[in-house]
Amino acid sequence: MLQVLAPFYSNLSGLILLPLLGSLIILVIPNSRVRLIRGITIWTSLITFLYSLFFWIRFENDTAKFQFVETIRWLPYSNINFYIGIDGISLFFVILTTFLTPICILVGFYSVKSYKKEYMIAFFICESFLIAVFCSLDLLIFYVFFESVLIPMFIIIGVWGSRQRKIKAAYQFFLYTLMGSLFMLLAILFIFFQTGTTDLQILLTTEFSERRQILLWIAFFASFSVKVPMVPVHIWLPEAHVEAPTAGSVILAGILLKLGTYGFLRFSIPMFPEATLYFTPFIYTLSVIAIIYTSLTTIRQIDLKKIIAYSSVAHMNFVTIGMFSLNIQGIEGSILLMLSHGLVSSALFLCVGALYDRHKTRIVKYYGGLVSTMPIFSTIFLFFTLANMSLPGTSSFIGEFLILVGAFQRNSLVATLAALGMILGAAYSLWLYNRVVFGNFKPNFILKFSDLNRREVLIFLPFIVGVIWMGVYPEVFLECMHTSVSNLVQHGKFD
């Protein structure tokens, strides 16, 4: 049935516009019609997710060309077009975006107490911009949506954040990411004036001198490194996570952290191959420092969200090591780990959100002995804790294994230090689980709170299925991205 219908639903611009259409519909509905707003938002987000699956169904694994390409004239007096398409690298990021959005909306309806309609509109706009980022094949269009994502996220953190410092965290998030991206804008303008185009496919055939590649690479790095984030521009992330609502943390960890690493893969590495080789030792150094530093910092944290936030920094810098190994195994492993992190970290933030909804605190010392009062939660939390420490059979293990294989081929010392980071990751993951679920039982504090209800368990089920699926049968994902990754490596002559 899906195969028959798929040819009629393979329009990327329609996928981008669908969440915006949903936001326009609920915009005109009165705030008092809560059930109608909830129904429209949930169904719109689910339809968007199903719509994105049609692109996977129709995707041709054996071609490195961009598929479902659309070109719309944007600026008539210049060679800048609304140019979109997807390949094996971007496909799953689009699906991950549409997968997480309905979950965020469902969580928000029960956790957000004010401005619910505006909350849904903000998430729909954010989803639309994120899909456009992953589909953009024009540098300027990419930049526009890359920066536009900041607006709904700024509002989500600043309006629906959980504590008094939410405004400061929102401004910190906005300014850090915006200031870094100004350098990328200058680089894009330079490229346009030098080549007369911002079309990615044309630019991939354009050879820049080594000196220009280095300068342009640095400009793009200034933007993407903040989004990863890499040390020392990671300060905004823990604060943003702590202050953001649960659903905001899910989108932030699940999707927004992938924008920087995706930017490296889509633009920096293929457009500036000589500069990429030149700066690879620099990236390795920063990544190893970030993995070890943030892992040790995580062990010292007392806030549940900060623990997961710092672990996200470590995982994303593990991704950059695999990506800059510049071989097929490392890059495919980095993509898999990004997808896995999008599932595992999102689920962990949902676990923290479930505790916060009941106990109104995220401080570790107030928890202990939850296994006796919340056995279902304890089991689910254990599963995602094990996935976070890359237990074999889970999605994270496959990604990190391929990254280590690729990194050993490029630099065995870096791979060894990255493996040390995995050990530290296991240490803080088990420490966290032991303190929260076992430890000293605090009856006066937690006895009156209930276990997860049916709705909350159903929210976790898709994450469990995804983590097991990627961990047990990763070939489904690898075969889609392999041709595109191979073409990337061959194009840069990295072999």
From Swiss-Prot:
Core subunit of the mitochondrial membrane respiratory chain NADH dehydrogenase (Complex I) that is believed to belong to the minimal assembly required for catalysis. Complex I functions in the transfer of electrons from NADH to the respiratory chain. The immediate electron acceptor for the enzyme is believed to be ubiquinone. Belongs to the complex I subunit 4 family. Its EC number is 7.1.1.2. It holds the Pfam family Proton_antipo_M. One of its GO terms (biological process) is ATP synthesis coupled electron transport. It comes from Marchantia polymorpha (Common liverwort). GO terms for molecular function: NADH dehydrogenase (ubiquinone) activity. One of its GO terms (cellular component) is mitochondrial membrane. It is found in: Mitochondrion membrane. It is a multi-pass membrane protein. It catalyses: a ubiquinone + NADH + 5 H(+)(in) = a ubiquinol + NAD(+) + 4 H(+)(out). NCBIfam families: NDH_I_M, PRK05846.1-3. The lineage of its organism: Eukaryota, Viridiplantae, Streptophyta, Embryophyta, Marchantiophyta. InterPro entries: NADH_Q_OxRdtase_chainM/4, NADH_UbQ_OxRdtase, ND/Mrp_TM. The chain crosses the membrane at residues 9-29, 37-57, 89-109, 118-138, 139-159, 173-193, 214-234, 245-265, 272-292, 307-327, 335-355, 367-387, 413-433, 457-477. This is NADH-ubiquinone oxidoreductase chain 4. The keyword tRNA processing does not apply. Keywords: Electron transport, Membrane, Mitochondrion, NAD, Respiratory chain, Translocase, Transmembrane, Transmembrane helix, Transport, Ubiquinone.
